[in-house]
Amino acid sequence: MKISESMFFLLKYVKTLSNTGKSIEIPQFLGYIKVTIPKGDFFMNVKDISTHCTRTEFVGTTVLDTIGLVISGIDDTLLQKMNIGTKYHALGLFSSRTGAAGQLTAIDDAVKATNTEILSIELPRDTKGWGGHGNYIVLGGNDISDVRHAVQLALELTEKYAGELYISESGHLEFAYSASAGPALQKAFHAEPGEAFGFMAGSPAAIGLVMADTAMKASSVKITSYMTPDMGTAHSNEVILSLSGDASAVKEAVLNARQIGLELLIAMGSYPEIPGTPYL
């Protein structure tokens, strides 16, 4: 038997004893040595970790692989490297593998309802390997209880806003609407403060452009941001349009975009899954 095979079976045997504290004899080239396997120190069993996290940093999770966390007193040296300013040491962290506008609308509502501030918004290239983004958002506040409340509220609202995300094998569509844009939507999409806000993203990108064109022709609205794979995104396969204006006009634009977007996406061969309940 090869040495590598011997070591493989030896390690398997050691692993079975790793939580027993028993002694075993390990063969050497010149005889044997006797060693005691330290109980619990040799191999970690990740299934010993509960799925119900009790860490103080943990706030919760929700749909779209979203997690909410807090840090009550961020390390000073790390804070200086984060490029978010040094005003706040109590931070809220909100991060998802899939989706952007739904979570950002939830964060926007949460910040408006609490004594917290948006410090940074990033849209990583993710969507678990699909065509779009995930999100990584940092909040700050003077009181960790305010920050925790904002993150908890955003987690709850994400379940609502996930209702306008449509994901199929062929692509995805995302829509959002807010009657009054706040600081998160202003920072991410240059929304007009206090005005109605609308958002649409389509993947493949060609569907997104047709949706954007349909929205602009449907009602009198103002473009606040326009993004493509090479412009404003992390090279996602999307065209993204956000709008501001009168509430009824913005909603009409988004609804018209949704209708044509769904027809085009379904024409590619499969019906989309919806991780929530449509709310528009």
Regions found by a protein language model. Give the residues of each.
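Active-site cofactor/substrate anionic-group-binding motifs, chiefly glycine-
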Residues: 100-131, 141-146, 157
